[in-house]
């Protein structure tokens, strides 16, 4: 009985100590008015460190400094060339500007480089490639005729290497865009890099091929022409692809390899201003970014491994008439030029180039830290690191719980029970931190208020980041304030919140690693610094000394906070402009809200619960809610209207269409004109309807049920994919088409067995045409003169078939045949439908007066990518 009394007395003393510690909680807690300072500290850190480093660009080198800075990229010279290209205007494939003027200019500039070349060290070979071909591009056959590339090979005379480094960018532009950023910027950088290579005493072992691709925008034809047909393509062992989704700023490395981590090692060793992340690669390859690059063509048809880099700053001007010289700084040219020149010298001397397949070792995990340095490791190493630190986190949490039990005298089960409750609270906070921003995105979409942040990106702070922060804080704070009888001291309870978040991240890290998602490195970074702080606190016994552990904890969270806020700030800067061209089917606010939520969870997941160090933590949450409400009120005012003239425009793609539907007997069943809109963002035609008369506009759903391809001349695979969401605005006056598109039936031959028929056609028309072919019921396409890929995979490619055709330097008509079979052998009745569209993209093609007036009436916040088009449907 004495032992029982002694044990009871000890339990009473422990309980008394705990109650005393909890009673002293309010006295020891930091005054509430310091809590805003705590939160503002992290905000100030973001603006003081992250934003300047994100915007940092090296000082441009001038031509007058070249003698004192030998071997360095000279941005001033490149900028002068950029101004020349800007003044040339749009360079549309098929126009004289692209096919002759631009080619001649490129040859002159290469000759200027040859004139200053060290002839004792280097030699230059130039080839103007003209090629025709075809390949399967998503859901269409992409055919091209006489596209042109200017190809330059630079070699060191003393080297016998037959392994080439390929550097690619494109010279053509989108209709209506000068394309100074996309991609004249990269073209002039390549020219200056070429110049620096051939005037330097530092030679390189492997020849460098500069591909000035003349047909990227229509789409990706020049790169296919080179890799499938050029005499130097078979020797290309590695690639640096240069493109742009913006104008100015830093270029981001967003794809690498695949399966060639040695390229990342050279990027780490060579790039002076690294900007890269595995997360961007996985997002891009998941199709969340509405773009494609030549990198895919070289990868799939080479295959050539490489690095895919693109300018992504100020994406508002991408593919618009505002992509001009004046929005690109000289310092941004210096940034890209220094990186490219160093990379070319590094890979140009790489021993791996002799046998790249021998160094194919799997995917890489890669990222830069604030642009200061670059980290990469192979995926297998990443798996080991992720598992090790996840397990280390779980083990140290268990050690901490045991330590709490030993110090307080509570049973391990009681401490574990408290941790279990806190884990549930942390899990609820994680769900709320993700769910509240998503809920905001859904509500704004339901109220037709998407894209309110498009021109004023700071609105995402109140719309998505603060709700996520509230979600992180709310469950833990409510638990602490409403539960008065805590078994553990307050300092330990706060540590339990961090432990719960650590366990959650460790579990997520293990799961994502198991399914092969390399972006799990983000959780590794969080775990690394938390595990380090916890280990030091346990060893130094700060773990058991009130709130002293929180000092080291916050210090160790500085670097993760800086990295995660930098990373997700970068993503928001890149992706927000893209939301206005992401299409109408998906709510773009969902993507932005997820990015904001993930950034908040990773940057503040360990830090947010620490508001409970202060008195009245609920008042902080109320204050944040008031700030969120204020932002919401601002967002539904004129400030939240998405578009602004020139700086952040609404993209409107529309065609002035003349349609004619011919029946089997030659009669015309439809002959009309109108404007066909391929809408680009979630707001659809609403902003136009508020500023101009488009009252007759109709949806195409009913047309899609009755007409092949909805009865409209969709341009390429993206237009065709979105055709059911398109709009049609009829007009009474006939659209004047500045040319003709003619389909001529040359011959119809029925086979001897009577069950097959061959139709021979000749097609004449403008630089871009599409054929849509749909066999009727009981009919099957068995052969044609196009690529057989679609016919060989009938379960993947179903009618109507889309064949896209473009010519560049040669407008000769194409002849083709279609071979079909019909189970009943009746070929004197309708067998198939064929639609022919002709697109007149160039600004040299005149728009009729009514179309010009319609374009003029568009609001000033609209950029229209438009052209006349004809569409004729025949039944044979």
Predicted regions located by residue number:
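Soluble extramembrane regions of membrane proteins in the secretory/endomembrane system
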Residues: 61-377, 777-778, 783-821
């Amino acid at each position: 009985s004495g032992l029982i009394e002694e044990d009871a007395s000890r339990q009473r003393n422990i309980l008394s100590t705990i109650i005393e510690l909890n009673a002293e909680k309010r006295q020891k807690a930091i005054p509430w008015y310091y809590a805003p300072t705590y939160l503002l500290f992290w905000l100030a850190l973001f603006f003081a460190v992250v934003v300047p480093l994100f915007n940092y660009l090296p000082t441009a080198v001038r031509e007058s400094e070249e003698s004192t800075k030998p071997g360095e990229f000279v941005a001033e010279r490149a900028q002068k060339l950029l101004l020349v290209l800007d003044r040339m205007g749009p360079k549309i494939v098929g126009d004289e500007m692209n096919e002759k003027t631009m080619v001649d200019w490129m040859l002159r500039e290469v000759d200027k480089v040859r004139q200053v070349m060290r002839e004792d060290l280097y030699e230059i070979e130039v080839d103007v490639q003209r090629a025709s071909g075809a390949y399967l591009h998503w859901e269409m056959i992409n055919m091209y005729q006489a596209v042109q590339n200017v190809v330059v090979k630079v070699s060191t005379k003393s080297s016998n290497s037959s392994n080439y480094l390929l550097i690619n960018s494109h010279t053509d532009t989108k209709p209506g865009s000068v394309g100074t950023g996309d991609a004249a910027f990269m073209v002039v950088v390549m020219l200056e890099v070429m110049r620096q290579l051939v005037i330097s005493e530092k030679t390189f072992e492997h020849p460098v091929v500069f591909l000035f691709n003349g047909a990227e925008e229509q789409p990706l034809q020049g790169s296919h022409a080179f890799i499938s047909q050029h005499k130097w393509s078979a020797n290309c062992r590695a690639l640096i692809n240069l493109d742009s989704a913006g104008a100015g700023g830093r270029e981001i490395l967003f794809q690498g390899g695949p399966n060639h981590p040695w390229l990342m090692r050279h990027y780490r060793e060579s790039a002076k201003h690294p900007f890269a992340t595995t997360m961007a690669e996985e997002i891009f390859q998941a199709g969340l970014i509405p773009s494609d690059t030549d990198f895919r063509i070289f990868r799939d048809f080479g295959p050539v491994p490489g690095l895919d880099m693109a300018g992504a700053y100020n994406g508002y001007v991408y593919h618009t008439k505002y992509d001009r010289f004046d929005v690109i700084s000289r310092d941004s040219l210096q940034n890209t030029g220094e990186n490219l020149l160093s990379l070319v010298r590094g890979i140009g001397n790489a021993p791996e180039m002799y046998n790249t397949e021998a160094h194919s070792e799997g995917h890489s995990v890669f990222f830069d830290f604030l642009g200061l340095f670059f980290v990469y490791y192979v995926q297998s190493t990443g798996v080991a690191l992720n598992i090790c630190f996840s397990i280390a986190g779980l083990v140290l949490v268990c050690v901490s719980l045991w330590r709490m039990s030993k110090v307080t005298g509570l049973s391990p089960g009681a401490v574990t029970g408290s941790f279990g409750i806190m884990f549930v609270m942390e899990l609820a906070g994680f769900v709320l931190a993700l769910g509240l921003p998503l809920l905001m995105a859904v509500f704004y979409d339901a109220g037709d208020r998407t894209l309110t942040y498009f021109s004023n990106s700071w609105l995402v702070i109140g719309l998505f980041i603060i709700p996520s922060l509230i979600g992180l804080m709310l469950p833990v704070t409510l638990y602490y304030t409403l539960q008065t009888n805590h078994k553990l001291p307050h300092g330990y309870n706060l540590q339990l919140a961090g432990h719960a978040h650590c366990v959650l991240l460790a579990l997520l890290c293990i799961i994502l690693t198991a399914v092969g998602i390399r972006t799990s490195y983000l959780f590794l970074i969080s775990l690394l610094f938390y595990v380090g702080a916890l280990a030091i606190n346990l060893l130094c016994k700060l773990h058991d000394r009130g709130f002293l552990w929180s000092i080291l904890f916050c210090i160790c969270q500085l670097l993760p906070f800086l990295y995660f806020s930098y990373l997700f700030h970068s993503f928001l800067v890149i992706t927000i402009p893209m939301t206005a061209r992401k299409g109408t089917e998906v709510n773009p606010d969902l993507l932005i809200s997820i990015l904001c939520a993930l950034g908040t969870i990773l940057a503040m997941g360990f830090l947010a619960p620490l508001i409970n160090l202060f008195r009245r933590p609920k008042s902080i949450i109320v204050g944040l809610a008031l700030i969120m409400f204020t932002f919401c009120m601002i967002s539904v005012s004129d400030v939240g209207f998405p578009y602004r003239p020139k700086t952040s425009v609404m993209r409107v793609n529309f065609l002035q269409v003349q349609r004619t539907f011919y029946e089997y007997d030659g009669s015309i069943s439809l002959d009309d004109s109108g404007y066909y809109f391929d809408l680009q963002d979630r707001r659809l035609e609403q902003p136009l309807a508020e500023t101009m008369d488009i009252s007759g506009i109709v949806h195409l759903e009913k047309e899609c049920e009755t007409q092949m391809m909805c009865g409209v001349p969709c341009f390429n695979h993206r237009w065709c994919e979105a055709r059911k969401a398109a709009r049609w605005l009829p007009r009474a006056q006939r659209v004047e088409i500045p040319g003709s598109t003619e389909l001529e039936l040359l011959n119809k031959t029925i086979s001897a067995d009577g069950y097959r028929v061959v139709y021979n056609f000749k097609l004449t028309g403008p630089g871009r045409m599409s054929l849509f072919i749909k066999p009727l019921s009981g009919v099957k396409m068995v052969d044609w003169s196009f690529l057989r890929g679609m016919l060989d995979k009938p379960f993947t490619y179903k009618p109507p078939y889309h064949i896209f055709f473009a010519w560049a330097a040669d407008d000769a008509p194409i002849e083709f045949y279609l071979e079909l079979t019909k189970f009943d052998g009746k070929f004197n009745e309708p067998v198939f439908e064929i639609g022919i569209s002709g697109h007149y993209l160039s600004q040299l093609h005149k728009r009729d007066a009514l179309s010009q007036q319609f374009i003029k009436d568009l609001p000033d916040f609209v950029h229209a990518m438009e052209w006349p088009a004809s569409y004729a449907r025949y039944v044979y």
